């Protein structure tokens, strides 16, 4: 597939970014504001609440990550407008101010000294205005280079490294050549193959930052593991699917970054890239956490190759699933957007599989719902660094 000159119909935001969805979200700052946020979403059709279990008595780097994730989620160009609800005005205002910098409509409400009833009523009135505002926004032609695409795999097996992951790599190579902004992560799943990623880094500075980030993550795992990471890395499902060591899993994981991409930069969790290219983000390998971090970093579409089958979705980031395992494609067909099992049967080659994935990306960018969206998978899971005070 020739991508040069290809366009899609996206939503141009005030800060210049382009989204492929037009959500109005109700974002709770903390766990005790979930009920109010969900009540607003129940009141106003066209809004989406993002409940989560955190936001109280966090501190230090963990609190910084909490704010960065919430603000980044609201700033994502797939979001047209945001209602923020918190228990008190200070932290609520911090999230509102961070999102307001994008120029999009955002309003904050707090429950202290107002109560649930008044907060829900006032937030619902503003949410109705935001939904009507969003409903009048129009898609416009945008160059394919304006797409920000993330990737993370899940429930991997031998078909992942042989079929689905290299398919993502083929697509990434072509998107990279067009100047798209791409990201991969899953720090622990590079174990044993980290030298291959380091060799792909654009310069010594990027290489040193990547190695430092990998070493920091490895040290954290060493501090907290027992004798090994059995049943975690690789998972029991990975082992049953034929991946018996973390090194095997890593070599398959790295297939997702293609052959011609170089690693242009390194991101902390939920950090926004500063330019196009392929970025590495320090992140967990837990699917819902990683995809949530990608959304908070500003990515608008996600490639999710799976072997044994994973049902992950996200409230604002469309997750495009592809699979090369014919059994999974048959038994979990409602979850798979792109069937690339033909690669293993030698019915199609990897370039053709990559083109199928790119075609699905453009269809998704133009408004087609992914299977995860259609099935209502909206996993929104925040990453924690340590326990609360």
UniProtKB/Swiss-Prot annotation:
Q: Which domain of life is it from?
A: Bacteria
Q: Which PANTHER family match?
A: ALTRONATE DEHYDRATASE, ALTRONATE/GALACTARATE DEHYDRATASE
Subunit composition and interactions: (2R)-sulfolactate sulfo-lyase is composed of a SuyA and a SuyB subunit.
Recorded catalytic activity of this chain's protein: (2R)-3-sulfolactate = sulfite + pyruvate + H(+)
Q: Which gene encodes it?
A: suyB
Protein's recorded name: (2R)-sulfolactate sulfo-lyase subunit beta
Q: Name one GO cellular component term.
A: cytoplasm
Q: Where this protein primarily resides, as one coarse class?
A: cytoplasm
Q: Where is the signal peptide?
A: none
Organism field: Chromohalobacter salexigens (strain ATCC BAA-138 / DSM 3043 / CIP 106854 / NCIMB 13768 / 1H11)
Q: Which GO terms describe its biological process?
A: D-galacturonate catabolic process
Fetch the InterPro entries from UniProt. Answer: GD_AH_C (IPR048332), GD_AH_second (IPR007392), UxaA_altronate/galactarate_dh (IPR052172)
Query: What keywords does the record list, in alphabetical order?
Result: Cytoplasm, Lyase
For the keyword Cytoplasm, the answer is: yes
State the EC number(s).
4.4.1.24
Q: Where in the cell is it found?
A: Cytoplasm
List the top taxonomic levels of the source. Answer: Bacteria, Pseudomonadati, Pseudomonadota, Gammaproteobacteria, Oceanospirillales
State any single GO MF term.
Answer: sulfolactate sulfo-lyase activity
**Stated role:** Together with SuyA, desulfonates sulfolactate to pyruvate and sulfite.
Give the first-level EC class, as a single word. Answer: lyase
* Record family assignment: Belongs to the UxaA family.
Q: Does the keyword Cytoplasm apply?
A: yes
């Amino acid at each position: 597939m020739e991508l040069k000159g290809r366009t899609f119909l996206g939503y141009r935001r005030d800060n210049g970014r382009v989204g492929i969805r037009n959500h109005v979200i109700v974002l709770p700052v903390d766990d005790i504001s979930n009920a109010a946020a969900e009540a607003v979403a129940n009141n106003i059709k066209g809004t989406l609440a993002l409940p989560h279990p955190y936001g109280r008595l966090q501190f230090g780097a963990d609190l910084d990550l909490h704010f960065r994730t919430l603000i980044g989620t609201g700033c994502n160009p797939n979001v047209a407008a945001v209602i923020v609800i918190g228990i008190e005005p200070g932290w609520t205002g911090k999230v509102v101010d961070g999102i307001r910098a994008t120029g999009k409509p955002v309003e904050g409400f707090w429950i202290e000294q107002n109560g649930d009833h008044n907060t829900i009523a006032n937030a619902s009135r503003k949410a109705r205005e935001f939904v009507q505002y969003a409903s009048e926004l129009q898609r416009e032609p945008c160059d394919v280079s304006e797409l920000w695409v993330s990737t993370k795999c899940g429930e991997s097996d031998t078909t992942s490294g042989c079929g689905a992951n290299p398919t993502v790599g083929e697509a990434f190579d072509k998107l990279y050549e067009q100047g798209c902004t791409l990201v991969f992560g899953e720090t622990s799943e590079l174990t044993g193959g980290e030298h291959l990623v380091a060799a792909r880094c654009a310069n010594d500075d990027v290489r040193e930052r990547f190695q430092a980030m990998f070493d920091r993550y490895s040290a954290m795992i060493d501090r907290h593991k027992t004798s090994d990471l059995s049943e975690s890395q690789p998972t029991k499902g990975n082992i049953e699917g034929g991946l018996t060591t973390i090194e095997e899993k890593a070599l398959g994981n790295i297939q997702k970054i293609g052959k011609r991409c170089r690693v242009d930069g390194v991101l902390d969790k939920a950090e926004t890239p500063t330019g196009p290219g392929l970025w590495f983000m320090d992140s967990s390998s837990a699917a819902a956490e990683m995809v949530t971090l990608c959304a908070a970093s500003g990515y608008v579409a996600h490639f999710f190759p799976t072997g044994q089958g994973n049902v992950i979705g996200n409230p604002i980031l469309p997750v495009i699933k592809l699979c090369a395992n014919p059994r999974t494609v048959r038994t979990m067909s409602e979850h798979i957007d792109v069937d690339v099992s033909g690669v293993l049967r030698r019915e199609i080659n990897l370039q053709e599989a990559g083109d199928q994935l790119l075609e699905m990306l453009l269809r998704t960018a133009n408004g087609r719902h992914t299977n995860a969206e259609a099935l209502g998978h909206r996993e929104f899971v925040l990453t924690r660094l340590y326990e609360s005070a």
